[in-house]
C-alpha cells in the first residue's frame, strides 16, 4: 500500500553547542527509483531555521539506515555519536545502508547511555535496529525525547506507553507487552516525544 511519510531531523540548541540528530535521506539510483523522495538537503533544511552546518558542534544518528544518515558526509569532522552495535552492523552487514554515507564520518562510538552535553544524553532504544538510540533533552520546563524510529508513529508509542501504564497500575491480565526501555523513558516523565517519520508529537 503506497504511503507518504516525512523523514525528519532535529536541531537541539544548547549553551555549549548545537546538536543535530539525524541528517536526512541519502541518494542512490535504486533508492530514488523505489522511494521517489522529495528531498530538502541538509544545508537547505538548516538554512530554513536560520543556521548552517558550521554552527553544529555535535551530531548523532538514531541508527544508520540510509534515510537517517544521508547528510553525514557533509559534516566533515563534526563528531557523530552512534551506538557501537549500530556502527558494527552498518560496516559489516550487506545491504544494511549505503556504505558511502558512513565512510569518512568521524564517529564517536558509545555503549549504552552516553552524555553528549550537560543535560543531553543518548539512551539505547533497540527494536527497529539492535543499535537504535534516542536523544533525551532535559530542559527547564521538562524532558523532551527525540525517539527517532523507535516507533514509526506517535500512535504506536502511545500504545506502548498505555501498555506500560497498565502493567504499572496492575490492571487485570492479559495485557499487551511493550519494549523494556519504555519504562526508562517514562520514568523521565517526558513532556513531549518526537519521531523521525511522524510529524505528530506524543504528549501525556
What are these regions (language model features)?
Residues 70-76, 204:
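Metal-dependent catalytic neighborhoods of phosphoester/phosphodiester hydrolases
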Residues 20-22, 80-81, 146, 193-195:
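A structural signal for short, well-ordered beta-strand segments and their strand-loop junctions
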Residues 21, 61-62, 125, 196:
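Short His-Asn-centered micro-motif
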Residues 25-26, 66, 86, 151-152, ...:
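Short, glycine/acidic-enriched loop or turn micro-motifs at the edges of active sites
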Residues 1-44, 134-152:
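Conserved beta-strand hairpin/beta-sheet module of binuclear metal-dependent hydrolase folds
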Residues 29, 38-67, 79-124, 129-202:
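Metallo-beta-lactamase
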Amino acid at each position: 500500500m503506497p504511503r507518504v511519510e516525512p523523514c525528519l531531523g532535529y536541531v537541539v540548541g544548547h549553551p555549549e553547542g548545537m546538536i543535530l540528530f539525524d541528517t536526512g535521506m541519502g541518494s542512490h539510483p535504486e533508492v530514488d527509483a523505489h522511494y521517489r523522495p522529495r528531498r530538502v538537503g541538509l544545508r537547505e533544511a538548516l538554512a530554513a531555521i536560520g543556521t548552517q552546518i558550521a554552527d553544529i558542534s555535535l551530531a548523532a544518528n538514531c541508527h544508520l539506515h540510509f534515510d537517517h544518515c544521508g547528510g553525514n558526509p557533509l559534516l566533515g569532522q563534526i563528531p557523530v555519536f552512534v551506538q557501537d552495535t549500530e556502527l558494527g552492523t552498518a560496516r559489516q552487514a550487506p545491504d544494511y545502508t549505503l556504505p558511502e554515507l558512513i565512510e569518512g564520518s568521524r564517529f564517536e562510538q558509545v555503549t549504552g547511555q552516553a552524555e553528549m552535553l550537560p543535560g543531553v544524553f543518548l539512551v539505547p532504544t533497540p527494536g527497529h535496529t539492535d543499535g537504535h538510540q534516542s536523544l533525551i533533552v532535559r530542559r527547564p520546563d521538562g524532558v523532551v525525547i527525540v525517539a527517532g524510529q523507535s516507533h514509526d508513529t506517535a500512535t504506536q508509542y502511545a500504545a506502548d506507553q498505555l501498555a506500560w501504564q497498565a502493567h504499572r497500575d496492575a490492571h487485570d491480565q492479559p495485557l499487551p507487552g511493550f519494549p523494556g526501555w519504555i519504562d526508562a523513558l517514562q520514568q523521565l516523565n517526558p513532556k513531549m516525544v518526537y519521531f523521525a517519520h511522524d510529524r505528530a508529537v506524543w504528549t501525556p
